UniProtKB/Swiss-Prot annotation:
Chain intervals with Basic and acidic residues compositional bias: 26-40, 87-121, 161-173
Region of interest (May bind the chemical integrated stress response (ISR) inhibitor ISRIB), residue spans: 171-180
InterPro entries xref list: IF-2B-related, IF_2B-like_C, NagB/RpiA_transferase-like
Taxonomic lineage from the root: Eukaryota, Metazoa, Chordata, Craniata, Vertebrata
Function: Acts as a component of the translation initiation factor 2B (eIF2B) complex, which catalyzes the exchange of GDP for GTP on eukaryotic initiation factor 2 (eIF2) gamma subunit. Its guanine nucleotide exchange factor activity is repressed when bound to eIF2 complex phosphorylated on the alpha subunit, thereby limiting the amount of methionyl-initiator methionine tRNA available to the ribosome and consequently global translation is repressed.
Regulation: Activated by the chemical integrated stress response (ISR) inhibitor ISRIB which stimulates guanine nucleotide exchange factor activity for both phosphorylated and unphosphorylated eIF2.
Protein name (Swiss-Prot/TrEMBL): Translation initiation factor eIF2B subunit delta
Modified residues annotated as N-acetylalanine in this record: 2
Region (Disordered): 1-173
Gene name of this polypeptide: EIF2B4
Length: 524
């Protein structure tokens, strides 16, 4: 009589035995196909049972962990008598390994929660008792830090120490500032930055000293003009540069230029276009091969600067002029604001090609820059009228379109331009007049800004003083502690007020700025 073999499995966790059905083929005879299939099914069922048992053990362990996680901090905060998870507790016999692991994990979470609670009592961050699950949202309210990055005292001290380490003179603040803009440096033309600077012993190249003085005195203004002047000065610096012995040009020249940029920043903050030009120049310098001769490498760098000026500024202005020409019709009344070299070039090109239109030039104090635009248009024969910004709302009913320049185009589509631009765009929207912004793509930056408070530039407050004969309004204003003068340079226009941005790549909406930035970064 054949004896049937019984497969017995003893579970190490629970001590239970599971008996399976008699296994055929135990006498040594060859198993049939049906018996093999049946044996295979039995093995699958065994694996399935093992997985189910492990799943129940894991669920039990997580439930215990969650329960102890909720109760644990309260027990620890209650008093020293309730000690959870100490070595004095005896582990009851007959528990599985999974349960022991879950209990140990719960004890660790409780101890961690107690430590966090103690830190919270001492003024630290609020305790996080348990890690939240995937579907839960944190119930605690996140608070803003006491200082943002722009007015953080430690960051400001670090920025002040940096020019000192580079042996760069620092400009002192002038007068009292409005509290909203206390984190921005206050510039004054009365405080000379180079008064006690000795040119032979200074680390700053004379070309950079001359450029910084031109920036601070307002002799070179405008994003394009400032960027071109910077690149020409860098060409002179590269021409006079000599690589020290046991040094590489690609490394030493980058470090050599850092104090120069710090000095220019002390004279006047760099524009977004200048930052992009410096970034590309540093990339060109670091890409110089060490096997090249010094003269060859320097000539290549100067050629790269010439190529950048031609492609990004000169040719870009010509392409923008062709696109903007399509938007100008005969009989148009075009309103422009301030002094934009690009807008002035577009209007003169359109007039030279035969378009008949009239220009309304809007200006604002204290710089009155639009007078330069007015002179260039009158010199080219373009009919133009001139007024100040408070009277702009009276002429907008007869204006057909507004043509504006830009200091920078931010990643969120906002336009950073001369202060007063946002006001004009808002009044134009109220009169249903389209607003067109002309801007080269090298002015696009990855910075995001929705207002003019976080990052801006404060010009000399003495420019606001109005001189009428011998009488000067607001004279000796520094002696009045309750009086503060604010001379903002830029404002931020939201993208909702701009209908179109004309670039060398074509006419795009403000929302396409991130796309252009992405394409430019991939090309580089």
């Amino acid at each position: 009589m054949a004896t049937a073999a019984v497969a017995v499995r003893e579970d190490s966790g629970s001590g239970m035995k599971a008996e399976l059905a008699p296994r055929p083929g135990a006498e040594g005879r060859e198993m049939t196909q049906e018996e093999k299939l049946q044996l295979r099914k039995e093995k699958k069922q065994q694996k399935k049972k093992r997985k189910e048992e492990k799943g129940t053990e894991t669920e039990t362990g997580s439930a215990v962990s969650a329960a102890q996680c909720q109760v644990g901090p309260a027990k620890h905060l209650a008093g020293p008598d309730s000690q959870l998870g100490t070595a004095k507790e005896k582990v009851p016999a007959g528990r599985s390994k999974a349960e022991l692991r879950a209990e140990r994990r719960a004890k660790q979470e409780a101890e961690r929660a107690m430590k966090q609670a103690r830190k919270g009592d001492q003024g630290g961050p609020p305790p996080q008792a348990c890690p939240s699950t995937a579907g839960e949202t944190p119930s605690g309210v996140k608070r803003l830090p006491e200082h943002s990055q722009v007015d953080d005292p430690t960051l400001l001290r670090r920025l002040v120490k940096k020019p000192e380490r580079q042996q760069v003179p620092t400009r002192k603040d002038y007068g009292s500032k409005v509290s909203l803009f206390s984190h921005l440096p206050q510039y004054s033309r009365q405080n000379s930055l180079t008064q006690f600077m000795s040119i032979p012993s200074s680390v700053i190249h004379p070309a950079m000293v001359r450029l910084g003085l031109q920036y601070s005195q307002g002799l070179v203004s405008g994003s394009n003009a400032r960027c071109i002047a910077l690149l020409r000065a860098l060409q002179q610096v590269i021409q006079d540069y000599t690589t020290p012995p046991s040094e590489e040009l690609s490394r030493d020249l980058v470090n050599k230029l850092k104090p120069y940029f710090s000095f220019l920043t002390q004279c006047r903050p760099l524009s977004a276009s200048m930052y992009n030009a410096i970034k590309l120049l540093n990339k060109e310098i670091t890409g110089v091969s060490g096997s090249k001769r010094e003269e060859e490498a320097k000539s290549e760098l100067r050629a790269a600067i010439d190529r950048y000026i031609k492609e990004k500024i000169v040719l870009a202005a010509q392409a923008i002029s062709r696109f903007a020409y399509k938007k100008i019709s005969n009989g148009d009344v075009i309103l422009v604001y301030g002094c934009s070299s690009l807008v002035s070039h577009i209007l003169q090109e359109a007039w030279a090609k035969g378009r008949q239109f009239r220009v309304v030039v809007v200006d604002s104090r204290p710089r009155l820059e639009a007078k330069h635009t007015l002179r260039s248009l009158v010199r080219a024969g373009v009919p133009a009228s001139y007024l100040l910004i408070p009277a702009a709302s009276y002429v907008l009913p007869e204006v057909s379109k507004v043509l504006l320049g830009a200091h920078a185009l931010l990643a969120n589509g906002s336009v950073m331009s001369r202060v007063g631009t946002a006001q004009l765009a808002l009044v134009a929207r109220a009169h249903n007049v389209p607003v067109l912004v002309c801007c080269e793509t090298y002015k696009f930056c990855e910075r995001v800004q929705t207002d003019a408070f976080v990052s801006n530039e404060l010009d000399d407050p003495d420019d606001l003083l109005c001189e009428r004969g011998e009488h000067v309004a607001l004279a000796n204003w520094q002696n009045h502690s309750s009086l503060r003068l604010l001379n903002l340079v830029y404002d931020v226009t939201p993208p909702e007020l701009v209908d179109l941005v004309i670039t060398e790549l074509g006419m795009i909406p403000c929302s396409s700025v991130p796309v252009v930035l992405r394409v430019k970064s991939s090309d580089q």
